[in-house]
Amino acid sequence: MAKKNTYSYQPKADEKIAKAAGHSLKISPKHSVEICRTIRNMYLEDAKAFLEDVIAKKTVVPFKRHNKKVGHRSDLKGWPSGRYPVKAAAAILKVLENAEANAENEELDVENLKLVHVCANRGVIIRGWTPRAFGRASPSNTPTTHIQIVLGEA
């Protein structure tokens, strides 16, 4: 029996929502947490524009938790440190577009959608080994991330 996909967001009884999830995406969990914190409670079009600007390296994502040895950005207002996590932003944008398609299928008003729930959780670690000199090997592990997005009408 397959495990049922559970969301950490529990909607109200009369709330119309659309959900989408990405499982075991090969992106950084730390970058994903920072992006999700930034786009939470944004309108759908604003979040898509923000992620496209991050991919084009026009907008900086503020790093508020995982910010050790992260450089300061002059174009970032209100917070000193930030980065351009392009790979994570592209993966989250795909999940966001999937949620938008699900909202259209649920006949929600796409112009008035808001991100009511966005979260990133650590997924499984894909173990790997890199051969080294003298018969040794060093671990080269790939972290994965689970993304959950829930859209609701504002």
From Swiss-Prot:
Keywords: Ribonucleoprotein, Ribosomal protein, RNA-binding, rRNA-binding
InterPro entries for the chain: Ribosomal_uL22, Ribosomal_uL22_CS, Ribosomal_uL22_euk/arc, Ribosomal_uL22_sf
Alphabetical GO biological process terms: cytoplasmic translation
GO molecular function, one term: rRNA binding
Subunit structure and binding partners: Part of the 50S ribosomal subunit.
Function: This protein binds specifically to 23S rRNA. It makes multiple contacts with different domains of the 23S rRNA in the assembled 50S subunit and ribosome. The globular domain of the protein is located near the polypeptide exit tunnel on the outside of the subunit, while an extended beta-hairpin is found that lines the wall of the exit tunnel in the center of the 70S ribosome.
Cited HAMAP family: Ribosomal_uL22_A (MF_01331_A)
This protein's name: Large ribosomal subunit protein uL22
